[in-house]
């Protein structure tokens, strides 16, 4: 009886909601890993775009309450259908293709991520956003010419230390979540490129 009573008290106290939310997330992560990572990516990507809009409003000292609702929706679509699933499978592939016991595994994984995955993923981001915004191929080409290299260089600066930690120290099942949390600010940066 005592353990059950103390458990009830613990759940009823401060922090019960975060504990239950975490337990639910871990359950969904175990039962539906790709769907859970997709949903998390969609939500956090949308939140990143919303954050970018709020930062932009503050920077311009705008007092209007209007926001571009389409921005967070586009980012949610991108996060749900692309970021979550692709990241899940990329990390899984990388873990099995370059196992920890391979010499210099951490460095090899980082190089694979930074030199192959990051440029391809960034190009995909520009392509999908161009499509979701209803723009044509010439707009995509202009975005690639004007925004790809600056964004990739910034990606390498910002994400290289984060990905080193993520790839080498974060458990495989949490890597997408770790990247999503860091990406809140990255998506805010990418969204600012679209202005």
Curated annotation (Swiss-Prot):
Pfam families named in the record: Mpv17_PMP22 (PF04117)
Membrane topology, from the record: Multi-pass membrane protein
Keyword terms: Membrane, Peroxisome, Transmembrane, Transmembrane helix
One GO CC annotation: protein-containing complex
Entry's localization field: Peroxisome membrane
Residues in the Peroxisomal compartment per record: 52-75, 136-173
Membrane-crossing segments per the record: 31-51, 76-96, 115-135, 174-194
Topology feature Cytoplasmic, residues: 1-30, 97-114
Function (record text): Seems to be involved in pore-forming activity and may contribute to the unspecific permeability of the peroxisomal membrane.
Subunit structure comment from the entry: Interacts with PEX19 and SIVA1.
Family, similarity comment: Belongs to the peroxisomal membrane protein PXMP2/4 family.
Stated name of the protein: Peroxisomal membrane protein 2
Lineage, opening ranks: Eukaryota, Metazoa, Chordata, Craniata, Vertebrata
């Amino acid at each position: 009886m005592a353990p059950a009573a103390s458990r009830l008290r613990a759940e009823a106290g401060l922090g019960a909601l975060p504990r239950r939310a975490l337990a639910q997330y871990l359950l969904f992560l175990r039962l539906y890993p790709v769907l859970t990572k997709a949903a998390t990516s969609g939500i956090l990507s949308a939140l990143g775009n919303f954050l970018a809009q709020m930062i932009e409003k503050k920077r311009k000292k705008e007092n209007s309450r209007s926001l571009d609702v389409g921005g967070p929706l586009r980012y949610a679509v991108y996060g749900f259908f692309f970021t979550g699933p692709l990241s899940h499978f990329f990390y899984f592939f990388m873990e099995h293709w370059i196992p920890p016991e391979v010499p210099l595994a951490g460095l090899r994984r980082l190089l694979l991520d930074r030199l192959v995955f990051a440029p391809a993923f960034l190009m995909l981001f520009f392509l999908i956003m161009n499509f979701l915004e209803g723009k044509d191929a010439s707009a995509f080409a202009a975005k690639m010419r004007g925004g790809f290299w600056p964004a990739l260089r910034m990606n390498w600066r910002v994400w290289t230390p984060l990905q080193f930690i993520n790839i080498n120290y974060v458990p495989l099942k949490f890597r997408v979540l770790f990247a999503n949390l860091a990406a809140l600010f990255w998506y805010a940066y990418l969204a600012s490129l679209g202005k």
